[in-house]
């Protein structure tokens, strides 16, 4: 009941968003292991379920998003809900610019390093979503991300909206609060107060080639967390 209400409210918010211009999102960061591909694939599926034309670009040399899409096709059939392509280096900027008129949303999954692919993606992106695990080694990289954002904004004519959030958050303990405090203090980056918990549902869904919102029976807590995260970003993107 609660989950259905959340999904309906989310759908309403998304339908309220003006789709006259293609929205481009880069899911990235400086450190690997923060769950970027999980976020990217779930965002692509989440948007596609709202009826949007979505392009998922795998700009990570590990090609995990490409592997997921291939596995998804085997499990759910030819119609996976979005278009998936692989691009690296400057081709990310060049090809996405050529393709953007064909899609309402483009989601770019980049690796956990400061690469040419990630910078090429950021130059053409409207939004930069950066997940952080609430661990010291992960949080320490936020200042490198901040520097990267500053460099991109210095050469980018259009605004780059940056959202940071906690992924794989602990169910309890001080680590979440301490990490959130650091992220909130970073100028030029918006902290999203909707963490994703460290839940088995994400790997369970990926193993079936599904997004969290497609699990049946659903994982209510994971679905609500994901919807809260994306809804927060979308509702603020219209401001």
Residue ranges and their predicted role:
Residues 1-26:
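Extreme N-terminal, non-catalytic leader segments
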Residues 24, 28-30, 34, 45-116, ...:
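P-loop/Walker-type NTP enzyme "switch/lid" segment
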Residues 39:
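Hydrophobic positions on the alpha1 helix immediately C-terminal to the Walker A/P-loop
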Residues 117-136:
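Inter-motif core of Ras-like GTPase G domains
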Residues 143-156:
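Conserved C-terminal guanine-recognition region of P-loop GTPase G domains, centered on the G4
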Residues 170, 180-212:
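Beta-strand-loop-alpha "switch" segments that mediate conformational coupling across diverse proteins
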Residues 203-227:
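Inter-lobe coupling/hinge region of RecA-like P-loop helicase motors
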């Amino acid at each position: 009941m609660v989950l259905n209400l959340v999904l309906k409210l989310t759908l309403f918010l998304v339908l309220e968003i003006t789709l006259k211009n293609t929205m481009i999102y880069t899911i990235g960061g400086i450190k690997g292991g923060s769950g970027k591909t999980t976020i990217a694939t779930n965002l692509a599926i989440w948007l596609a379920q709202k009826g949007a034309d979505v392009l998922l670009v795998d700009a990570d040399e590990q090609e995990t998003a490409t592997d997921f899409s291939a596995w998804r096709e085997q499990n759910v059939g030819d119609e996976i809900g979005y278009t998936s392509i692989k691009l690296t280096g400057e081709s990310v900027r060049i090809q996405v610019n050529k393709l953007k008129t064909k899609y309402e949303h483009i989601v770019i999954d980049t690796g956990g390093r400061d690469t040419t692919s990630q910078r090429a993606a950021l130059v053409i992106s409207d939004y930069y979503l950066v997940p952080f695990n609430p661990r010291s080694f992960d949080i320490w990289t936020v200042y490198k991300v901040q520097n990267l954002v500053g460099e991109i904004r210095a050469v980018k004519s259009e605004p780059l909206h940056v959202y940071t959030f906690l992924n794989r958050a602990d169910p309890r303990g001080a680590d979440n609060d301490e990490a959130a405090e650091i992220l909130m203090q970073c100028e030029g980056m918006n902290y999203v107060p909707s963490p994703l918990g460290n839940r088995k549902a994400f790997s369970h869904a990926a193993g079936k080639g599904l997004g969290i919102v497609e699990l049946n029976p659903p994982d209510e807590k994971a679905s609500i967390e994901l919807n809260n995260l994306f809804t927060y970003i979308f509702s603020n993107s219209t401001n």
